[in-house]
């Protein structure tokens, strides 16, 4: 058997593994979704301090913030803290306007220009925590919106034995433009299922930084979120620290929504290259498993080798089944794909492959106008005020 034919069969094996990996991740996601449908807590609700670290105007910011003032939660049992570097932040008047519409919900505005660490988000969280009154803390990004029952469901996790932290998977919505649509297909179709699989199968403390509910007891046990101000992946490292401290870390598929409206291709590429480099620094050899996420490159490699016509037909059927399964799973969990999205699935796969390759090398990234180099465990080694 020639080397060319062997390569063809090897590529087909890779395609088969890619399909199997997607099936496993989809099952893990659906299982997590079923577990998240428990009854929200009624009576004896714990106090929650909701912390919003804001820097600039995120997509859909006003509507996102509004959703937190419409939570179905007892008056006086939660508060919302907005944290800024200064009153000059363009998000401040928006947050103030929303808060003024809801005087019954306690709101606190924190301004602290100090940057003791390279992670600006952690700096904002740290400043706000000094003013938080309750024993449960919800870290929530500016582009996140929630349903009214969200907080009741979230706090119900803490009725279980020794839970110290629960984070929430998210669904990206509202994408406009090709680049944003491709990004949304990755976020909803690859990232969420992969995160659920790692959490369920490998018992990794996969923490999604968009929405993290953590007990103050767990935070105190790991010396607070400020201990991670020099790292870029503060969410994953917080989850790992909380678990090592003896607390349970849970991943909820009671999805929050994120606004991913319209971004340039350059912005999408920079974001996902940064994330890929972070995952490589954290995952080590496990990063290689991400090569199974996109099915199309394996199909094209099989097609290029063309060891047998029957194998080509089988490969094409597997690829079609993979995409149809993603469309079906999306409908089940509430992220229905339209025709334009479905036609972009192959482009999404090629983009994911390119991002994987880009994440293999380099350390220099840009985040919110700052250039930095990522060190071991995403340690921020250098920091400047100019984007890379």
Regions found by a protein language model. Name each.
Residues 66-116:
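Acidic donor-binding segment of Leloir-type glycosyltransferases
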Residues 9, 16, 20, 27-31, ...:
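Membrane-embedded multi-pass helical conduit in multi-pass membrane proteins
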Residues 230, 236-258:
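Catalytic donor-sugar/metal-binding loop of nucleotide-sugar-dependent glycosyltransferases
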Residues 1-44, 181-185, 193, 197, ...:
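N-terminal membrane-anchoring/stem segments of glycan-assembly enzymes
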Residues 48-57, 64, 71, 83-85:
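A conserved hydrophobic helix/loop-capping motif in glycosyltransferases and polysaccharide synthases
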Residues 99-130, 134, 153-222, 226, ...:
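Long helical/loop segments within the catalytic core of UDP-sugar-dependent glycosyltransferases
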Residues 90, 141-157:
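Acidic donor-binding/catalytic loop of UDP-sugar-dependent glycosyltransferases
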Residues 46-49, 79, 237:
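Cell-envelope/extracellular polymer assembly enzymes that use nucleotide-activated donors
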